[in-house]
A protein has these predicted regions:
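Conserved ABC ATPase "signature" region
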Residues: 9, 21-29, 120, 124, ...
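Conserved ABC ATPase signature
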Residues: 153-157
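Catalytic Walker B motif of ABC-type/P-loop ATPase nucleotide-binding domains
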Residues: 178-182
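ABC transporter nucleotide-binding domain
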Residues: 196-285
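Short, charged/small-residue-rich alpha-helical element at the C-terminal edge
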Residues: 253-324
């Protein structure tokens, strides 16, 4: 049975249409017209316990609205949601015990309290047994390297330190599900990798279900096997990350290091870009040829010292889908 399930989920907002100037504002007091803005339309998906799912889309696509409905903050206009067997907006308190939330741009820590006291306060709010609290906190302090700033007021922490504290705070009560909204925004490379390693650890060690919304697709590639793409409030793709790469990442680049510079290097039917001599880059469509066949053609004409295959970036693939919409490409035919 899925731990999260949505059926025909829809959320719209009404706003008053006002005319211009003072007259328009006064007129709206007596005769109101409304316009409806649909944020989420007919969203259907289910998530099994223990999955790590990337929920991604451009700004304004409906990601945050969906997360707010899953957490019980917003009530759907129509459709149904179940999270761990509960309807979130009907059972908000029980739902809150089942979930943890980390927002990259907002903190649940108490600004004026030292980090340790913030954790103690959250323990009391969630009524976490003291033995379990100590066990969880000891593990988080070790894996997130929190010890050196546990006595520091939250307002004095760096962004990276605060984010690590927020992750510990979100997981102290052993939630079944964690919603992560831009968890690595603004962090440096080292801090990002520490956060990614922590997410992978809690998923593997505790079986925590993770829903990740982010614009940093390196987070998605590092953590998720499955992604849900949403655009203009509608799910346009739901499936494995590798399937998306296979369907849309059709163009690869073969980087060839020649034994000697070849300024007139050419290969019929292949886009050639000259790099720092003696390197050339060959862009090819793997639906019509293979890297092996291309290497064979090159070695028949030139002496080479090294080759490497560069796969398309996931960011480029997703950008293309946003611009063109998702359509499953036809099956590829490859050269022998």
């Amino acid at each position: 049975m899925p731990i999260i399930e949505t059926r025909d989920l829809r959320k719209s907002f009404r706003s008053v249409v006002r005319g211009e100037g003072l007259g328009g504002a006064v007129g709206a007091l007596f005769s109101r017209r409304y316009e409806e803005k649909v944020a989420v339309e007919n969203v259907n998906f289910s998530v099994e316990a223990g999955e790590v799912v990337g929920y991604i889309g451009p700004n304004g696509a409906g990601k945050s609205t969906t997360i707010k409905m899953l957490t019980g903050i917003l009530v759907p206009t129509s459709g149904t949601i179940e999270v761990a067997g509960l309807v979130p907006y009907e059972k908000r308190r029980q739902n809150a015990r089942n979930i943890g939330v980390v927002f990259g741009q907002r903190s649940q820590l108490y600004w004026d309290l030292p980090l340790r006291e913030s954790f103690e306060l959250l323990r009391a709010i969630y009524r976490v047994p003291r033995d379990r609290f100590r066990e969880n906190l000891a593990h988080f302090v070790e894996i997130l390297d929190l010890e050196r700033f546990m006595a520091t007021p939250v307002r004095q922490l760096s962004l990276g330190e605060r984010m690590r504290g927020d992750f510990a705070a979100a997981l102290l009560h052993d939630p079944k599900i964690v919603y992560l909204d831009e968890p690595t925004i603004g962090l440096d490379v080292v801090a990002k990798e520490a956060i990614r390693a922590f997410i992978a650890d809690i998923n593997k060690r505790l079986g925590t279900t993770v829903i990740l919304t982010t614009h940093d697709l390196a987070d998605v590639e590092r953590l998720c096997r499955r992604i849900i793409l949403i655009d203009e409030g509608t799910v346009i793709y739901d499936g494995r990350l590798e399937r998306l790469r296979d369907e849309y990442g059709t163009h690869r680049t073969l980087v060839v290091h020649l034994k000697d510079p070849q300024p007139d290097f050419a290969l019929p039917g292949v886009d050639v870009e000259h790099g720092e001599p003696p390197m050339v880059m060959l862009r090819f469509d793997r639906r019509t040829t293979t890297a092996e066949a291309l290497i064979r053609r090159v070695t028949e004409r030139y002496a080479i010292t090294d080759v490497a295959i560069v796969e398309p970036e996931m960011e480029d693939i997703v950008r293309r889908i946003y611009l063109e919409g998702y359509q499953k490409p036809p099956a590829r035919a490859t050269e022998a």
